[in-house]
């Protein structure tokens, strides 16, 4: 199950927050502040005391308890940061937008393994790393644009590619498509597309849940899980439009270099 602290946090910390909205840490904070989020927002940057009007802490250790962290710092600093958040700050929701993990080299893959091990120990959930983020009707935890006005009757969009998320949102918004949630899972180090489908299935409410799901996949960690929950959602009246990339040799190389995906014939 996906932790409630990721889905509906009462407090969010942006680690690596910036006043420069051209940087991920700046655009994340801007999008979060402009979203529907009603909880507490904290920022961390060792060089700042205030970022975009929000009090800034110089160290993660100085933060109060926080439900969810959106992390935009160099990969090498992420394992220790996650460790502090998970074990000292009670954090269970994590979005890591930083690159430099399993998609890059073995050292990055080791960082990823350490992070997942830590988050699993506290029963938390991770989107990413190497992603553009996550947004639902509770808050926007993404650094890309455009950010759609979310609609409970819109589609749930799940993608392994942040660039594809941007393209689909841009094209969809100009053609009348609305969104209920957008999950850009990146490397899928812990939460993958099949886990999002499981969440959409097990929390499905015929009165309030979206009936349309769009999926762009670069890898499938657990094909049987994906099929099980896809079938269940379809039986509940949902429609699913899915594309699996990486079928050709060129596509496989692109997926591997992009998110570390090992494309197969699935």
Question: What kind of feature is each model-predicted range?
Answer:
Residues 1-266:
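Catalytic-core regions of core metabolic enzymes
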């Amino acid at each position: 199950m996906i932790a409630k602290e990721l889905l509906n946090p009462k407090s969010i910390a942006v680690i690596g927050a910036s006043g420069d909205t051209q940087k991920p840490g700046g655009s994340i904070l801007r999008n979060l502040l402009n979203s529907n989020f009603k909880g507490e927002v904290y920022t961390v940057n060792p060089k700042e005391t205030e970022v975009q009007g929000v009090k800034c802490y110089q160290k993660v250790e100085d933060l109060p308890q926080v439900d969810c962290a959106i992390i935009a710092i160099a990969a090498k600093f992420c394992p220790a940061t996650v460790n502090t958040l998970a074990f000292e700050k009670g954090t269970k929701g994590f979005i890591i937008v930083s690159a430099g993990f399993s998609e890059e080299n073995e050292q990055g893959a080791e960082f990823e393994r350490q992070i997942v091990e830590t988050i699993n120990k506290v029963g938390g959930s991770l989107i990413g790393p190497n992603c553009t983020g996550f947004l639902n009707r509770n808050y926007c935890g993404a650094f890309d644009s455009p950010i759609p006005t979310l609609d409970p009757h819109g589609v749930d969009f799940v993608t392994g590619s942040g660039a594809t998320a941007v393209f689909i949102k841009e094209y969809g918004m100009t053609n009348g498509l609305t969104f209920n949630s957008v999950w850009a899972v990146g490397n899928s180090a812990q939460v993958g597309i099949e886990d999002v489908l499981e969440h959409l299935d097990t929390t499905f409410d015929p009165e309030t849940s979206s009936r349309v799901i769009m999926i762009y996949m670069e890898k499938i960690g657990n094909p049987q899980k994906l099929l099980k929950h896809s079938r269940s959602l379809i039986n509940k009246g949902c429609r699913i439009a899915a594309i699996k990339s990486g079928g050709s040799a060129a596509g496989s190389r692109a997926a591997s270099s992009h998110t570390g995906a090992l494309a197969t014939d699935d």
